[in-house]
Each structure stands twice: as C-alpha cells, then as structure tokens.
C-alpha cells in the first residue's frame, strides 16, 4: 500500500507496532502535521499516537489497498486539564484586573496565541470591556473578586486547541445610581475558554471575558 497519510497534532509522535515513524518530511498546517508513509505491507498494525501531557491514542488498523490513513486528535490528560483550569483562572483574573486598570490590549497580549494578533475582533472585544468598566455615567465599578474556578472540557480537542467551560464565584463591587456602595455576587458564572498549544505553551485564542459580564 502506497502513501498512507496520518494527520496528528504537531508535537505528537506516530508509531506502528512500537516503531516510531519518521516525521522529518511531514507537512504542517494549523497546529497539525501530516505524516505520509511511502509504502506499507498489507496486514494488521497497532497504531499509537503519543504526546506529553495528552492521553495516548491506540488502535489496531487493518491496512489494505482501500486504506488511505486518518486524522487523529488527542485528549488532554487529567493533569493537563487540571493545569489548564488553573491557568484559565489566572488568565481571567489577569485580564479582568488589567481591564479594571484601563490597560491596553498591547499590555495583555502575551497571554494570547499568535493567531490572535491579526484578529481585530478579540482586540475590539477587550477594548469594549475596558470601556464598559471605565464608563461611570450610570454606576462606577470599584472592585472585582473572582474565585473558586472549576474547569471542564467543552467538546473534543481539534487542531491543537482545547476548549473549556470555566465556572467561578463572581463578586462585583460598585457605586450604584444613588451614590451608595453596593455589590453583586453570582456563583457559577461561566467563562468560555479556548487554548492553543504554541511552542509547548498554552495560549488563549479567544477573549474569555465580555462587557456583558458586568452589572
């Protein structure tokens, strides 16, 4: 069988019958790489895809003349998911505190993936949050306390990206319409977070906070 193609995450390794397949000639695109095996005898093989921090994928494949290969995505390990949940909490708090201080997108861009740098929507959405916080026409936001973060996987990972739903306890402090100190608390406040792996680091591809989060 000639030219079998397997598409896997760019940092992963492919092996057949415990032999790692050379990926030096692989093509890469959007966080994935495609490994083409020039020739393979027909028969049954144990295929395995592994990557640090991800659950290994293993299956038996029956290679025949009608076999063309496949695309495989990996699930994060429990340790990786827990670490990403903690990172999401840190990143959300950082973005909220930065917006509260009126910082520009340029001052927070290091938490985002390189693909976001050309995405004006994310930059504009962040500026909307800053503008909402800084707008004191109706109420004046004086402080935020976001804690008790909990993350769960949201759908299947794809193209080296992992999406999560993060819940947290939200405490918002502000001066209300009548000039009195007030606060609003909500448990289970949801944030939708997507991370992309770049050079071994997980970076945000979307803005997890929005102007509608505030009173």
Q: In which residue ranges do the predicted regions lie?
A:
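Exposed beta-sheet edge and beta->alpha loop/turn motif
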Residues: 1-44, 48-52, 153-215
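Generic signature of intrinsically disordered, low-complexity segments enriched in small/polar residues
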Residues: 42, 48, 60-63, 108, ...
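Structured interaction patches on ligand/partner-binding surfaces of diverse proteins
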Residues: 52-80
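Core segments of small alpha/beta cavity-forming domains
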Residues: 77-146, 215
């Amino acid at each position: 069988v000639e030219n079998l193609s397997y598409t896997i995450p760019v940092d992963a390794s492919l092996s057949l019958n415990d032999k790692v397949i050379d990926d030096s000639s692989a093509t890469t695109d959007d966080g994935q790489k495609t490994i083409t095996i020039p020739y393979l005898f027909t028969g049954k093989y144990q295929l395995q895809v592994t990557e640090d921090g991800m659950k290994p994928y293993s299956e038996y494949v029956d290679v025949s003349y009608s076999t063309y290969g496949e695309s495989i995505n990996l699930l994060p390990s429990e340790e990786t998911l827990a670490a990403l949940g903690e990172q999401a909490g840190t990143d959300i708090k950082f973005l909220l505190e930065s917006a509260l201080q009126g910082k520009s997108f340029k001052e927070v861009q290091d938490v985002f993936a390189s693909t976001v740098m050309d995405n004006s929507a994310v930059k504009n959405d962040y500026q909307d949050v800053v503008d909402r916080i800084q707008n004191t026409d109706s109420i004046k936001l004086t402080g935020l306390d976001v804690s008790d973060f909990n993350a769960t996987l949201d759908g299947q990972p794809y193209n080296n990206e992992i999406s999560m739903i993060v819940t947290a306890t939200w405490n918002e402090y502000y001066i209300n319409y009548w000039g009195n100190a007030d606060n609003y608390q909500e448990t289970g406040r949801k944030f939708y977070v997507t991370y992309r792996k770049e050079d071994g680091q997980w970076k945000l591809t979307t803005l997890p906070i929005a102007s509608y989060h505030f009173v």
